[in-house]
């Protein structure tokens, strides 16, 4: 693990009781304020064993920052310091929106989980585009993904994704189409086959001429087998670069925290088994033809390795950092090297689907 990540982990361990005593959203905003002045990262954590290629992009290591942490692209420049091999910002909508009323973010400390009902709060694509353009001029040592969504009050949500593509694709290494948040009423209906086909056709038509960017699709974990089959069929037919499995769940396994009754999407440790099963289900449904990115409940190298062996080419983390500290990505990446060597793989990417 880098000295930078080690030092910040040590500082976070001291500050954790105070952080956990603070309102979750306020603590997050303080974290962003602390990260924003950091210098731009010039190097990424990588090695021949960790480097991974997907969708024509080179990822220095397979551990990425999930969207939601840096909604407005304010701290992407600093995140490679903490070991991330790629960074995904957003979700960004065409117009700024406040999101749902507060409180809307709850830490379930006893369960090592989070419930959120943020509702795509963000400053809009125009403001974020200015920051990302500046970042692009100075360079970033890892791929940058931009996660796009629809405004809550939009009269045409499919058109919102086309607008987002036109605005953000020129600045992105890849785009993620997020139709899986449970906190925007009706959004998950866009996972239905007909709606998904129309949405992806609109996204494709809005891509920059001659410079189309890879498109990833982020799906919910609360899907029936027939839904998975339909999504896989559409993804393969429309040439999607990958599917991200998965977003938060509306299901409620047994939880100890008093916040368990709060409405919203559940992430963190209780999501891990369901998210792993989703990777396995999408791998089986696609026959290994559709690249997958795993998210949901990953808090260790062992869990990341399990998702990779189940069929994921990359992994993303966010919620676990609240409990494990900012050096989590670095620890996972270095741990993946150890696990790959233990199991006889020359590269982590060689293990993708090895346990499927």
Swiss-Prot record:
The keyword Oxidoreductase applies. Its cofactor is FMN. GO terms for molecular function: dihydroorotate dehydrogenase (quinone) activity. The keyword Flavoprotein applies. It catalyses: (S)-dihydroorotate + a quinone = orotate + a quinol. The active site is at 181 (nucleophile). It comes from the Bacteria. Its main location: membrane. Keywords: Cell membrane, Flavoprotein, FMN, Membrane, Oxidoreductase, Pyrimidine biosynthesis. Substrate binds at residues 71, 116-120, 178, 183, 247-248. GO terms for cellular component: cytoplasm; plasma membrane. Binds 1 FMN per subunit. Its EC number is 1.3.5.2. It is a peripheral membrane protein. FMN binds at residues 67-71, 91, 147, 178, 218, 246, 268, 297, 318-319. Pathway: Pyrimidine metabolism; UMP biosynthesis via de novo pathway; orotate from (S)-dihydroorotate (quinone route): step 1/1. Disulfide bonds: none annotated. Pfam families: DHO_dh (PF01180). GO terms for biological process: 'de novo' pyrimidine nucleobase biosynthetic process; 'de novo' UMP biosynthetic process. PROSITE patterns: DHODEHASE_1, DHODEHASE_2. It is found in: Cell membrane. Monomer. Belongs to the dihydroorotate dehydrogenase family. Type 2 subfamily. Catalyzes the conversion of dihydroorotate to orotate with quinone as electron acceptor. This is Dihydroorotate dehydrogenase (quinone). It comes from Sphingopyxis alaskensis (strain DSM 13593 / LMG 18877 / RB2256) (Sphingomonas alaskensis). The gene is pyrD.
